[in-house]
A protein has these predicted regions:
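Structural/interface elements that position substrates and couple domains in central-metabolism enzymes
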Residues: 1-440
Length: 440
């Protein structure tokens, strides 16, 4: 099938590339001409495992193209996917400016002789956005244009997005016509995964509800972790005991510094706003957000309690990306920690395997020193803070680390190190919701 993806950011590029890998002919469109030139050269502007090799492969065989023109791209396409940003407004609502602009451009480019088109919202949008997209197309398109609107939310996890697209848990297709539903089912025919057929409104709401529920699990286990810290219980054992119940599962019951990134914070706020707009206070989600917003502050309080005064203390931070296997620092808890540490006068050094370049514009003005080597980052540090769960940090050479630090004190915000291993080397170790290890 011939497909157009409008928006060549994280979602659009990954989706378009994986569709090409399935055998479709795909044109990814973006109004950033520099980005288009970069993509045409075979380079990609983001770090995502497996993505760059698939881009190069599918460009080489002619299944994947990049263009700055919506009008030229959609003429031969059967399906047009909208995958543009939907950033949050200050009140938590979603800014649909890009959606509206792209919808108008699509409408103005559509002609009756192009035949039937299916226009798909891939971006995360509030419920009933599909109705507005349909109204906009009808208003700006010429007469006799045939189209349908579909909602097909993405459920990609940064760091494993390619696998999530090619081997999804489920595919949600929201359509109000059988013809549109059948077209999108053809798009996904190469993938063997359960398909949930819904109306457009339900599909739009599923995305916000799903992400908000996952955020709820994270905040729940972080609240449990605080109880564990006061009682000497181990939150990892708690999570195992809870997660062994098949009705709950172990996934996302990982105590730590909280969630970040471009999806969970935005989607939780948006769902709260949607509910509030409908006159339905969603106090449960408001508490989920509150727990997450204060989790890193609680962690910082523990560091301060241990050091007494943070001013002029050298503190090393391992990890800047909001999670492992990405260079994305949007809403990264690590950066929030760095900001607060610097604000109290600490001397902060930081490192990350992939996110140094994305974090630098934010951290350099704070005075954070960025160091490529993780051990050099920790040299002479009084405390090491682990803020991102990179495997490099989980597998650190503890003897080497002990040799470069001024004090053998670690605050592990992601619970990736073994207390027993640290005890054997003589570290003082504090994590989230687990008993601390005192210095030997």
């Amino acid at each position: 099938m011939n497909l157009t993806i409008i928006g060549s950011g994280y979602v659009g590029l990954t989706t378009g590339t994986c569709f090409a890998e399935m055998g479709h002919h795909v044109i990814c469109v973006d109004n950033n001409t520099e980005k288009i030139r970069t993509l045409q050269s075979g380079a990609i502007p983001i770090y995502e495992p497996k993505l760059e090799e698939l881009v190069k492969k599918n460009v080489a065989v002619g299944r994947l193209e990049f263009s700055p023109s919506i009008a030229a791209s959609i003429a031969e396409s059967e399906v047009i996917f909208i995958a543009v940003p939907t950033p949050p407004n200050t009140d938590g609502s979603v800014d649909l400016t890009y959606i509206e602009k792209v919808t108008r451009e699509i409408a103005q480019a559509l002609q009756p002789e192009m035949g039937y088109k299916v226009i798909v919202d891939k971006s995360t949008v509030p419920v009933k956005t599909g109705e507005k997209v349909s109204q906009t197309i009808k208003h700006y398109a010429g007469p006799n244009v045939q189209f349908d609107i579909v909602s097909n939310p993405e459920f990609l996890r940064e760091g494993c997005a390619v696998d999530d697209l090619l081997h999804p848990d489920r595919i949600v297709i929201g359509a109000n016509s059988e013809q549109a539903m059948n077209v999108i089912k053809r798009v996904y025919q190469p993938i063997h995964a359960p398909i949930l057929e819904t109306d457009v409104n339900s599909a739009e709401l599923i995305k916000h509800a799903a992400n908000s529920f996952l955020a709820l699990k994270i905040s729940y286990i972080n609240a449990v972790a605080k109880v564990c810290e006061k009682t000497g219980a181990d939150v990892e054992l708690m999570a195992e005991g809870i997660g062994m119940d098949k009705r709950i599962s172990r996934h996302f019951l990982n105590a730590g510094l909280g969630y970040g990134g471009s999806c969970f914070p935005k989607d939780v706020k948006a769902f709260i706003n949607i509910s509030r707009t409908l006159g339905i206070p969603f106090t449960l989600l408001e508490e989920v957000e509150h727990i997450n917003d204060t989790q890193h502050i609680h962690f910082l309080d523990r560091i301060r309690d241990r050091l007494w005064v943070l001013k002029d203390k050298k503190i090393a931070v391992w990890g800047l990306a909001f999670k492992q296997n990405t260079d994305d620092v949007r809403e990264s808890i690590a950066l929030k920690l760095c900001e607060k540490l610097c604000g109290e006068g600490a001397i902060v050094t930081a490192t990350d395997p992939k996110a140094m370049h994305t974090a630098a514009p934010i951290l350099n003005p704070m005075g954070v020193k960025l160091v490529e080597d993780m051990y050099e980052c920790a040299r002479d540090a009084e405390v090491l803070v682990i803020a991102t769960e990179w495997s490099e940090y989980a597998n650190a050479d503890l003897q080497k680390l002990a040799g470069v630090m001024r004090n053998r004190i670690i605050f592990d915000g992601r619970n990736i190190l073994s207390p027993a291993n640290l005890r054997a080397v003589g570290f003082e170790y504090h994590s989230v919701g687990r008993p601390s290890v005192e210095e030997a």
